[in-house]
């Protein structure tokens, strides 16, 4: 055995960011008496190139999130030929005129927040026969600069979505920045229970452990997996 081989054999295996995040999810779930399998890790690959995504695919990650339909359409068809079991989630705001493209490409749509989008998605689903799961986005902090329906508008939006045939999996939120997120996550959980929904898309790189302890079923992790976000022209 050469000295080089001996040194390599003795070197400890580095813990990847993906493994570290999965471990943190498992620990947070245990605190709440939950199973790690109850939490879906969405690796948010928006603005990151294929070269940054492939290592996670090789490590077994199969659920990814994108913000924009066009960007996802540029990256994912070729990757899906090699990894056909990938589930792709749209987590950004969606224009109604992109509804058909989103339905064709994504397996889940997280930011359904207005009646016009519900109508467009319902039409696209009827025409294509594809019915991605949908999460209704709630503006949980009543912030005018953010998307999401007002809490008071949620019952009507949910009724419209169900009438249009959207498979409503649950609710999604982005809590206000620089404040304790737990009360907002708890409020989203209460709203979901009140409306007979079980899915909770909440929690990002800075607060996903809190979200998991409060009941998140989907956490959206970007920078903790990929590092600083890239930019697009």
Language-model region placement:
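Active-site loop ensemble at the mouth of alpha/beta enzyme cores that anchors a bound cofactor
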Residues: 232-233
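Conserved alpha/beta-domain cores
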Residues: 2-198, 204-206, 212-214, 226-228
